[in-house]
Amino acid sequence: MNSNIFKALALAALVLISGQAWADSRVDKANQHYAAEEYENAIQLYEDVLNSGMEAPELYYNLGNCYYRQGLLPAAILNYERALLLAPHDKDIRYNLELAYSQIPDKIEPLGEIFLAQWFASIRNTTKSDTWAWISIASFSLFLILLLVYFFSKRSALRKLGFFVGLLFLLISTTTFFFAKYQKERLVNRNTAIVFSPSVTVRSAPDAGSTELFVLHEGIKVKLLQQNNNWYEIQIEDGNVGWIHAEHVEVI
């Protein structure tokens, strides 16, 4: 029994190691093709690695660059967006994404956002969910320590310090917890997509015979509100809502 368990664990470890070695080899070859400007070969290898289940912002970023060099803007934007989900703080990813968006046909004015919301979003996007989670845990631990100082210290000055600084760390812990939760939900609940069709008509209902509302073009980002069979109800940045067939978009 124990021997069989050991063999099973050893086999699982071997599979993981060999799988990692395979992925590393493919990534190295893809990087070589990218450096040599052999973008089609690089794309195939990067896609192979990603389809195997391995994810990293660098992979999506390099793949996005390959598609961009090939003039395939929707695919470039899709992969830059996926890279940004994993590394929201990365300025290079954000710059290339904005550059790609500047070249798509549709120029939509987003709904106005209050300054405080923009400020919070800029702070929230300075790092990824795991980092925010660690900051939240560390801050809460410091809050507990300072709480003990407040309850058990006999010196008034230390009690005041423990109380007010403890409240500060509790606030930091709570805020960073919600930052981590937001970033994690974006990763898990992929509710945005990129239009891949050159032109698509947005309709009033999930029916090809329903009223035509407006037209979107390739490369634009849409928010997915709900799904009805093979149709998505989508919202664009200016607040307009409608339905498009799922074949026209790729989920980020």
Regions found by a protein language model. Give the residues of each.
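Beta-loop motif signature
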Residues: A35, V195-L224
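SH3/SH3-like beta-barrel superfamily modules
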Residues: L213-A246
